[in-house]
């Protein structure tokens, strides 16, 4: 099977999340959740929903019950909650070690290449 690089775009928080979600700190959503075992990859259909929180953290909201967090192995200069993420994916979906660039909305100029870490699921604890 030949692996050809593909590009995936992930719009920033302002374009994808409901207003109530945009108005609060995304990291506060981890309160009351328990971290699961890290995984290397997400399904391809989840990549478009990855959201930058700061220069080291991406999140994906799978459902009201499960949120995925990706702590990048290094700081990604220029990455923030208004970034458009452009991924270079080899295979089915974003995986640990895959690279991406952050593009400032309106500028079109990509930032430096950054790498993904492992994806950690956080599941809401049932009362």
Predicted regions and their residues:
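A generic structural signal for short, solvent-exposed coil/turn residues
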Residues: 11, 33-34, 50-52, 62, ...
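Helix-rich interaction surfaces within compact, conserved domain-sized segments
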Residues: 76-127
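Bacterial N-terminal signal peptides that target proteins for export
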Residues: 1-7
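N-terminal secretory signal peptides
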Residues: 20-69
């Amino acid at each position: 099977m030949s692996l050809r690089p593909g590009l995936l775009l992930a719009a920033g928080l302002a374009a994808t999340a409901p207003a109530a979600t945009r108005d609060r700190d995304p990291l506060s959503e981890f309160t009351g959740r328990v971290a699961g075992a890290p995984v290397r990859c997400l399904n391809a259909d989840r990549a478009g929903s990855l959201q930058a929180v700061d220069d080291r953290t991406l999140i994906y909201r799978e459902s009201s019950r499960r949120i995925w967090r990706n702590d990048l192995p290094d700081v990604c200069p220029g990455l923030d909650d208004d970034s458009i993420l452009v991924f270079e994916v080899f295979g089915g979906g974003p995986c640990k070690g895959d690279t991406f660039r952050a593009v400032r909305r309106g500028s079109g100029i990509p930032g430096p290449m950054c790498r993904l870490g492992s994806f950690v699921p956080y599941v809401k604890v049932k009362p």
